[in-house]
Amino acid sequence: MSTLPDEAKELLRRPLPAWATTVRPDGSLHNTVVWVDLDGDDVIVNTAVGRAKEQNLRADARVSVSMLDPEDAFHWVTVSGTARLETEGADAAIDALAKEYLGVDTYPYREGEERRRVTIRITPERVLYKPGA
């Protein structure tokens, strides 16, 4: 396990889009934009059950999440590790992310296939952090 530097945590706590990369069954990479939160050193992502990233992680738990500071392209963090999928508390997690990213108390798109949620908890195994120019 790797720990996140405080400066990297500060960046990851900002409501900025991040990119999550998972491994498809054929070995190719799947990249998608996500919202992130932190729980200690764990990176928290939330998705709808059945999405490609959730299916990919059930088959191969390796994942990498990157975030770039839009004000400084040389200020970024990448956290790579192993994901655990958690359904308990997933609705509260997406609501907390919606509060941070959208400024609303509840996630407004929870309908149809977006209804069932899963939290992706990423335990860092490798952290790359660039403090900026």
What do these predicted ranges mean?
Residues 1-17:
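Extreme N-terminal tail/first-helix region
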Residues 2-3, 75-133:
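Charged, gly/pro-rich active-site loop segments
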Residues 8, 16, 41, 75, ...:
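A generic secondary-structure signal marking the coil-to-beta-strand transition
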Residues 9-10, 35, 55, 110-112:
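Short secondary-structure boundary/capping segments
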Residues 15-49, 57, 63-67, 76-78:
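Short beta-strand segments
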Residues 48, 69-70, 124-125:
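Short secondary-structure boundary segments
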Residues 51-53, 72:
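Short, surface-exposed beta-strand-loop junctions and turns on beta-sheet-rich folds
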